[in-house]
Amino acid sequence: MHDAVTRPTPPADATAWPRRITQAVKIGGVTVGGGHPVVVQSMTNTDTADIAGSVKQVADLWRAGSEMVRLTVNNAESAAAIPRIVDKLRMMGIDVPLIGDFHYNGHQLLAAEPACAEALAKYRINPGNVGFGKKKDLQFGQLIECAIKYDKPVRIGANWGSLDQSLAAQLMDENAQRETPWDAGRVLREALIRSALDSAERAVELGLPRERIILSAKVSGVQELIAVYRDMASRCDFALHLGLTEAGIGSKGIVASAAALSVLLQEGIGDTIRISLTPEPGQSRTHEVIVAQELLQTTGQRAFTPMVTACPGCGRTTSEFFQELAGVVQNHVRAKMPEWKITNPGAENMTLAVMGCVVNGPGESRHANIGISLPGTGEAPSAPVFIDGEKSVILRGENIAQEFIGLIDQYVERTYARRAG
């Protein structure tokens, strides 16, 4: 059992809790926290020194919707590659903020490669491995001094798997002196939070403004993550980065991330997220970006692309056509969004329905901006289309998919077209 955490009373209506008030952190052209929309970020899995491969993957992630991209900076070659990666991306018209992920030797790499220090939009620092023993404070200070020199924000990110062992041991010793000792899990959660908070306050003492700091304290368990972030959010006003350390592969990773992050987001906690999925063989790295966007959209935080409601199918829907049409519609609107974002702003808020029989089909279709109710088993071979709650037309024949796509495009142009003046 986890210790009870005081939380606000849920709202009476179907909305989320108000967003937590935090510092606003400027990262390149993106602002995190301060009431701004929750930001989607991702991380490459290329060798950063492979400039061509890294540029391609960053570009792919950006096109998929990642608003910040983190890259490993673990040696001199990767540090030297960063400014070249930034230059090549800008030549492609891509100005996405790049975050340098540092462990163990970040203080050395940034000092040796000032062009890297300048090119990065943010530094990620792990207080659990920034230095050990007497070197810890010195090396942490060198990283913060670099951030101050180049006016860069930092994320101080504590991780369950690389926790500051000296701090953990100290808290274990203190716990042993309690009249009623905490369980080991609570002590470790406190160590994780303290590692992040104490490091942040030390950075402020060294001269880094509070509005240049983001915090994270990641674990891999859903309930542990929720408990850690609720506690940390109640103890500071820093912007928070949400994510499981390792969510896992396939549906497990998606479900775990959604289970943890949706609870926190609905409570107003979290200013930027990453879904740390393990890609399945042959799967694009961009999948984690799509999942992050869908999580934010389904929880009502942001809108990225029109949402398609589709029934799961049952014995009344022996035809697979409605399933195929739902996929075609989803792919069409996702492919059109980069264009619509410019020419038809607001189209991302559109709702669509592709239903498979008369039971819920007409009702769900009326709730959507545009919906189609396809015939189920034994029903007449016709498909009524509803637009803004009213029956508009009945589609029949072999070209239902093309005609329905055409109606969607017409609706977008009619409803969301950017008007001159």
From Swiss-Prot:
[4Fe-4S] cluster binds at C311, C314, C357, E364. Its cofactor is [4Fe-4S] cluster. GO terms for molecular function: 4 iron, 4 sulfur cluster binding; 4-hydroxy-3-methylbut-2-en-1-yl diphosphate synthase activity (ferredoxin); 4-hydroxy-3-methylbut-2-enyl-diphosphate synthase activity (flavodoxin); iron ion binding. It catalyses: (2E)-4-hydroxy-3-methylbut-2-enyl diphosphate + oxidized [flavodoxin] + H2O + 2 H(+) = 2-C-methyl-D-erythritol 2,4-cyclic diphosphate + reduced [flavodoxin]. One of its GO terms (biological process) is terpenoid biosynthetic process. Pathway: Isoprenoid biosynthesis; isopentenyl diphosphate biosynthesis via DXP pathway; isopentenyl diphosphate from 1-deoxy-D-xylulose 5-phosphate: step 5/6. Keywords: 4Fe-4S, Iron, Iron-sulfur, Isoprene biosynthesis, Metal-binding, Oxidoreductase. Its EC number is 1.17.7.3. Transmembrane segments: none annotated. It holds the Pfam family GcpE. Binds 1 [4Fe-4S] cluster. The keyword Metal-binding applies. Converts 2C-methyl-D-erythritol 2,4-cyclodiphosphate (ME-2,4cPP) into 1-hydroxy-2-methyl-2-(E)-butenyl 4-diphosphate. Belongs to the IspG family. NCBIfam families: ispG_gcpE, PRK00366.1. This is 4-hydroxy-3-methylbut-2-en-1-yl diphosphate synthase (flavodoxin). It comes from Xanthomonas oryzae pv. oryzae (strain MAFF 311018).
